[in-house]
Amino acid sequence: MCSSDLFAESLGMGTSMVVLMPQAAAGIGMEGSDGASGAAGADGTGRDGAGADGRGRGVPVLYLLHGLSDDCTIWERRTSIERYATEKGIAVVMPEVRRSFYADEAVGEKYWTFIAEELPELIARTFRISTAREDTFVAGLSMGGFGAFKLALNHPERFAAAASLSGVLDATSLDLSWTGTLGERVWAGNEIAGTEDDLLGLLAQADPAALPSLFLDCGTEDELLDHNRRFITAAEERGVELASRLRPGAHTWDFWDESIQDVLDWLPLQDR
C-alpha cells in the first residue's frame, strides 16, 4: 500500500490518494503462500524490479471512487479491498475528491479535471501500471458510482469496464437542499441536464458499441433505487448492454463489501 499526499496542479493545492499494488508473490496468510511477504515497492516493482506481474508488464488498474461522506481511505477501512485485489493481481487507485461530485466545481476546485486528466497521467508516471484500455477499470459507490459512470460515458475510449454500486445515477433529479451549500458550490444552480454530469442524457446519445462494459448493483431498500431503475431503463431503450442487479440490501458497507468482490470477479481481466 502507498498512501500519498501530493500537489495537484489542476486543484492548485495538495490532495491525497491511496494506491494498492498487487504483491509480487503470495503473502503470509494468502492462499498459496510461500512464506515470503511479496510486498511490492512504491513503484509497483517486486524485489527483482521486473514489475508486479513478474514479467515487466504493467499491471491492470481499478480506479475505486469514494462516496459523498467519505474520503480516499474509506474502502480500505470498511472492506478487505487489499486482499481482494491482491488475489486478482490488480492495482487499485483510490483518490480524494471530497464532496465534489467528481465535477469541476462552480465555486471551488477542478476535481473533474483532476480525476479525468491529471490523475491518470500521474499514476502512469509513478507506478508500473498498464495504460491500455483493456487493463483500465473504474468503480465507485454512491457519489463514486456517479463518478465511475461519468468517466465511462465521457471517456469510453479509456476504460474496458465500469461499475456503479448504489450510484447517484440521475443528478438532474437530486434534491440538494439536504446537502446545504453543496449544490451551489458544485453547480451554482445551473441546469445539469445536457451537461457532462447528466448520465441519462449521455447514455441516450452514446454509441452502444463504443462503451465499456457496465455493471450496476443496488439494494432494493436503498434510497437511490429509483436512480438505478431509471438508468436500467435508459440503457435498455438505447440498446446498451448493462449487467444490472437489484437485490435485497441498503446503503451500507455490508452491501458494498460483498458487491466489490463481485465487481472484481466480473472485470474482464486479461490472462497475464
Language model segments and positions:
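Non-catalytic cap/lid and distal C-terminal segments of serine-dependent acyl enzymes
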Residues: M1-R272
